[in-house]
A protein has these predicted regions:
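Glycine- and aromatic-enriched periplasmic loops at the membrane-periplasm interface
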Residues: 60-62
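A generic structural signal for residues embedded in beta-strands
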Residues: 38-40
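Amphipathic alpha-helical coiled-coil/heptad-repeat segments
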Residues: 70-71, 75-78, 82-97, 102-171
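Sequence-specific dsDNA recognition surfaces
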Residues: 3-34, 53, 58
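Conserved catalytic-core motifs characterized by acidic clusters
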Residues: 14-15, 49, 95-98
Length: 171
């Protein structure tokens, strides 16, 4: 389960919280597959766009655009980045501005010919895969830091000081 605050993340690699199978069945939410482009349509995150790197559900303040055989996540993500200001211009509501889900559904999408689209995917997909890999690696490094730092600060783990390591390469 992700809330709209998660859309601030460049890539969504973990949920805000977890939902049970029963919770999924009893609610109106749908499971969004990995590589879905998500857009925050209300509140402080209005207009923020992210890409799911996991399967997850979202609350009603998020719209998901699922890739298909023609339009992959890489294309949808950048197309939505390109037109988001138009969507925001259509916002409605008094107290809390929001973009109507129907307006998202009405957005026209540029359809390049298949050859151009395939060339685009060949160029962009490796970069998207690397970004995804880096996001997961960063999260693992953060967890490792959070595990080790308190132990280092308390003295539970000691780092041996090797004089050879401390010598500058410039000396």
């Amino acid at each position: 389960w992700i809330n709209s605050g998660k859309v601030n993340d460049y890539r969504i690699i973990e949920p805000s919280e977890y939902i049970t199978e029963l919770g999924l069945e009893k609610s109106s939410t749908k499971l969004l597959p990995k590589r879905t482009t998500v857009i925050a349509i209300t509140g402080a995150t209005l207009g923020k766009i992210s890409l799911l790197e996991i399967d997850c559900c979202a609350n009603q303040s998020i719209v998901g655009i699922v890739e298909n055989n023609i339009f992959k996540g890489e294309y949808i993500y950048f197309w939505m980045k390109n037109i988001i200001n138009r969507l925001i211009a259509w916002q409605t509501g008094g107290a809390q501005q929001h973009v109507n889900k129907d307006n998202v559904n009405k957005v026209n999408i540029l359809i390049p010919n298949e050859k151009i689209l395939q060339k685009y995917y060949i160029q962009v997909r490796p970069m998207f895969n690397k970004i995804s890999s880096n996001c997961f690696e960063n999260k693992n490094l953060q967890r490792l830091r959070d595990l080790l730092l308190p132990k280092l600060m308390s003295g539970e783990i000691r780092v041996p000081i090797n004089s050879k390591v401390l010598i500058s390469k410039n000396n």
